[in-house]
Amino acid sequence: MYNQLTREQRYAIYLGIQERRTQTAIARQIGVHRSTVSREVRRNSNRQGKYWWGIAHERAQERRERSARNRETPAQVLREARRLLVGEDWSPKQISGWLKRKGVAISHERIYEMIREDGSGELRSHCRHKMKYRRHRKRSRPTRVTNIPGRVSIHCRPAEADGRRFGDWEMDLIVGKGQKSAILTLCERSRNYLIMERLPQGRQPDAVAETVARLLWPYRRNVLTITTDNGVEFCRHRKIAEALKTTVYFADSYASWQKGAIENTNKLIRQYIPKGTDFRELSDDYIHSVQLKINRRPREKLNFSTPKDEFFKLLL
């Protein structure tokens, strides 16, 4: 009987292949039959024969979700728009752009009308802003940071790292209830691809650095820069830079717009993990499901393609 592999098992397969170990040895290490490893590698390797554990796990998750949900296409366009709004939490503009790529025409204005016409308020609850908008003024203050040895200012970052080049990343932490739990978030700026993981040790700097290096290691050839804020949890940035052969740059204080990709991504995450949540009560599978959902959300900047599709196009 075929057993579903875990993320950890797929990562072990990836490392075993890198170390040129046999499939039999890898299978013995992770406790599965050799045929399971053989099938996994054959099924999820790219055209060049390279196996990427991250891609493999996302494909497996999507196959499981497709088999679990009803895939019947609604007869009416409004029903399909409603499904995408409620089921995927996409914005009206994302729904309109995505359906247009599929040859179905509906304006985002009409979808907003549908939301306003819904007396129950259910559709409104799936909009990120709940149909309420606030204008924020950007402020800038002088940066004086003394808690990060060897800090490299964002003003030293290459001009090419402006958000259009592939391989420039941003990172941040989302902190849970009582500052007792944290989730690390990483975002590739040009494609908005998200990687996130809960930190069992919270904001402990060494654990943060080790997790960043581990999560980005499979993509290390495409990690040209990393930009973050001045949180003390990132004080071991040299450890990250050494592991990935890159440079970590720090934004100015009170200038969150200097790392806008990760800030906007964190707001999307808050749709599923609201402020005041104790992350210790969330399963790793749930956190990964949030990552999957955000990465398959179409973006206007990508011509309504998805971060997942565009990221792996350039990777493969």
Locations of the language-model features?
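Basic, flexible linker segments flanking DNA-binding modules
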Residues: 55-59, 63, 106-161
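Acidic/histidine-rich, metal-coordinating catalytic segments
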Residues: 221-236, 254
